[in-house]
Amino acid sequence: MTAMMAQTKDLELVIRHVLAGLGHGIHAGRERGAGVEFSEYRAYAPGDEWRRVDWKLLARADRYFVREAERDSHVATWLWLDATASMAEPSREINGIDKLWFARTVLACVAAIAQRQGDAFGLVICTDGKVEFTQASRGPRQLQRVLAALSKAKPEGSLPPADVLKANLHFARAPSMIFAASDFLDWPSPLSEALLRLRNMRHDVRLLTLRTQAEVDATFKSGSGYRDPERDEGLHRMSNADREIYRQRSRAHFEMVTGSCRQNNIVHYEARIEQPLSGVLRSWLRLAGARAK
């Protein structure tokens, strides 16, 4: 199914497929919605979820009513996409998908959820040494702007310098939720430092680390030449003897990423781009929701 979704250029179509059956949102906002704390009833309207219908009241009143709730807080949602050259790494198991495709599709789904909840949401893209913004706003038109920017993103160059990122953190002055998707091959890095700084500014930071199964298992072809796409260091040929060293270093690196996130109370979820996208999205949101309780 992931391979089929990768063939379409219609990001909205992919979003509809992924979000079908996803039964929860990003957070609790102040506008009325299907929250936990019961507030009042209102008449059923087309598009309401059937699980919110009060069937006992239907039996008494012979009309459909849905339960509403007053949600707790209202914060902006920011999507942060790493669109540097390393995100072009493709799956060796599923044709047509790479890290960037997976990252932008997951973030597009988060944007769609935010739009459904009535939240303001914006987009930050790190690519080719610069930062690109889509300012936070609400509504269907904003969703179209964000989807267009995500669709145009190409995996190019390296991360912006630390001073450039630091100078651009003004976008999140008010308390915000920040959903960042990257391979986090560099940590510490200008990106990780910016995200940690945002967390220290009391923003709710939630990270998604994307890897390929080949990266995890080190199932690279022996003798083939590999080049770091973000550094000009020539070709590296991985022998069989190099594999175990690679695995150890890779394991240590991502354990460091996980430990740093835990130490700073940052939600962190690691996924393979070969996994079903809907399952990754659901797990990431549930992990974030569990911390919020």
Label for each model-derived stretch:
Residues 1-30, 38, 43-48, 57, ...:
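Exposed, interaction-prone extracellular/peripheral surfaces
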Residues 35-38, 52:
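A residue-level signal for beta-strand positions that form part of recognition/binding surfaces
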Residues 51-61:
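N-terminal low-complexity, intrinsically disordered segments
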